């Protein structure tokens, strides 16, 4: 791969990038300057200021004629650069002193170059995933998901993957940096399950996965990377966080804390559970459930994950009742209703932040549960 500095007609802004990519190949510029990837840094890398600047990352393996390039060379292409050769396009800027600003995107390119030899691959495709996640995520060559987050969280994800390595529905970690600066997952092809078409089939897979959870013998409760003192403390924290985003008219806290008190007297199974087990992390292909991604590994009760999954999508909620969940989980009605009340309160908070259009349905379900 080479990284080129492009000016004039090879530049475009981020908003028009997708539209541009859909229409034509990129015409060659009269001003394309080569930069060696390992020499890009904020201290020694700068260009004379022009109106617009773009970094163009090109996979030289896909070019018919690979130009001989060294740092500082100006390159002239006689033909348009094929889109298949474009790995990434990155606008960059100058500060008030006309000094080049090393953007996070450039750092990402350098980071990916560091990873490629560890995977023993030549990178010919590079894509960002930024769909509502707190992690920094890339897709390489359509096969590898590279994730950056806090080392504590990534370590817990790696351990979760190892624990369930024999479960084909749980995404597999294939590489972890020794200090957990990043981990690399296998990519599960498909689409996020925004719409649930086959509820019975999905519930079968939800039950199959939650029934497969293994005992957790560590001292932690709740999130492994940010543990609580107990399972009940974890639930109280989740409820408190949810209460901060719900309006005062949602005067449901007395019922929620009563439900927490009920759970204190119910059987508790301490298992290693997914922790963010919702349809937003379920992948489907050709209508079929094929896998689950993005765990927040948690030491907790499998019932938490089961109900979390059922509440994560309004298509499922419309079919729920306490009796239905008792039948599906085999847990007592007392425990199911208590966990349902707690989880539903937290789900209404998430709904306000991510999909407000469903809130009325969740509120209606709340009153339905309270009336039972």
Mark where each language-model region is:
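A conserved alpha-helical element in kinase catalytic cores
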Residues: 108-118, 133, 143-184, 193-212
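An alpha-helical support segment within catalytic cores of ATP-dependent transferases
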Residues: 111, 215-275, 285, 365-370
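A glycine-centered beta->alpha junction motif in the catalytic cores
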Residues: 151, 179-198, 236-244, 342-359
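Active-site Asp-x-Gly
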Residues: 272, 284-330
């Amino acid at each position: 791969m080479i990284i080129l500095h492009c000016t004039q007609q090879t530049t475009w802004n981020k908003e028009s990038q997708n539209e541009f990519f859909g229409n034509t190949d990129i015409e060659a510029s009269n001003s394309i300057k080569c930069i060696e990837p390992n020499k890009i840094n904020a201290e020694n890398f700068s260009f004379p200021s022009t109106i617009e600047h773009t970094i163009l990352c090109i996979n030289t393996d896909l070019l018919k004629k690979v130009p001989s390039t060294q740092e500082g060379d100006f390159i002239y292409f006689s033909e348009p650069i094929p889109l298949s050769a474009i790995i990434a396009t990155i606008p960059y800027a100058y500060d008030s002193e006309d000094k080049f600003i090393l953007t996070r995107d450039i750092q990402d390119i350098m980071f990916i170059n560091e990873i490629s030899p560890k995977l023993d691959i030549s990178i010919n495709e590079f894509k960002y995933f930024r769909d509502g996640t707190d992690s920094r995520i890339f897709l390489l060559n359509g096969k590898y998901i590279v994730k950056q987050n806090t080392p504590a969280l990534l370590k817990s994800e790696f351990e979760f993957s190892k624990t369930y390595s024999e479960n084909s529905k749980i995404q597999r970690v294939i590489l972890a940096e020794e200090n957990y600066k990043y981990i690399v997952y296998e990519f599960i092809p498909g689409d996020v399950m925004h719409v649930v078409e086959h509820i019975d089939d999905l519930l079968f897979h939800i039950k199959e996965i939650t029934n497969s959870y293994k005992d957790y013998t560590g001292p932690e409760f709740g999130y492994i990377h940010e543990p609580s003192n107990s399972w009940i403390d974890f639930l109280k924290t989740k409820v408190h966080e949810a209460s901060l985003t719900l309006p005062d008219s949602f005067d449901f806290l007395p019922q929620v804390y009563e439900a927490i008190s009920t759970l204190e007297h119910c059987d508790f199974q301490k298992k290693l559970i997914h922790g963010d087990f919702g349809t937003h992390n379920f992948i489907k292909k050709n209508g079929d459930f094929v896998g689950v991604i993005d765990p927040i590994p948690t030491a907790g009760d499998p019932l938490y994950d089961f109900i979390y999954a059922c509440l994560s999508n309004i298509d499922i909620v419309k079919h729920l009742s306490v009796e239905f969940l008792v039948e599906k989980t085999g847990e007592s009605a007392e425990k199911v209703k208590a966990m349902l009340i707690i989880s539903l309160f937290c789900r209404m908070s998430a709904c306000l932040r991510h999909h407000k259009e469903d809130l009325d349905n969740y509120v209606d379900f709340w009153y339905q549960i309270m009336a039972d």
